[in-house]
Swiss-Prot record:
Similarity remark: Belongs to the P-Pant transferase superfamily. AcpS family.
Subcellular location: Cytoplasm
Known function: Transfers the 4'-phosphopantetheine moiety from coenzyme A to a Ser of acyl-carrier-protein.
Protein name: Holo-[acyl-carrier-protein] synthase
Keywords recorded for this protein, A-Z: Cytoplasm, Fatty acid biosynthesis, Fatty acid metabolism, Lipid biosynthesis, Lipid metabolism, Magnesium, Metal-binding, Transferase
NCBIfam families in UniProt: acpS (TIGR00516), pantethn_trn (TIGR00556)
Any one biological process term the GO annotation gives: fatty acid biosynthetic process
Entry superkingdom: Bacteria
Organism: Burkholderia mallei (strain ATCC 23344)
């Protein structure tokens, strides 16, 4: 396996909160996958600030992932097709669905993700990995 791409994103939590308020909550439904949406609602019910921070980290994760795989937010990379979930240990991991999952599987691409947030910002870093020949072809190093 070799690095296919890396991506990072920094989201301003207050900006995410403003968009959420302006859209009457529809922003969360547009951006979050079904499992993420359940966690968002549960966290927001306990603490508005923690719910918004969760949304900011997941928005940031989708942006960083889209950069790592080199697609940006273009098909098959869609907001809801990628979810960042947490293992019982707290470790984040990504789960793709639908056409994005098929696109990743066809290339053997996997990813590692880390997310963090403080009061004002959420940050994500993603490393996408692929078989050596796939990564080399993307970088232009293939013969």
């Amino acid at each position: 396996m070799a690095i296919y791409g890396i991506g990072t994103d920094l989201a301003q939590v207050s900006r995410i909160a403003a968009v959420l308020e302006r859209t009457g909550g529809r922003f969360a439904e547009k951006v979050l996958g079904p499992d993420e949406l359940r966690v968002f609602h549960a966290r927001r019910a306990r603490s508005e600030a923690r719910g918004i921070a969760f949304l900011a980290t997941r928005f940031s994760a989708k942006e960083a992932f889209s950069k790592a795989i080199g697609l940006g937010m273009h098909w098959p990379m869609t907001w809801r097709a990628l979810q960042t979930l947490n293992r019982p240990s707290g470790e984040p991991y990504v789960v793709a669905s639908g056409e994005l999952a098929a696109w990743l599987d066809a290339r053997g691409i996997t990813a590692r993700v880390t997310v963090s947030d403080e009061r004002d910002y959420a940050v994500t870093f993603v490393v996408a990995e692929a078989p050596d020949d796939v990564a080399a072809a993307r970088s232009g190093a293939a013969s």
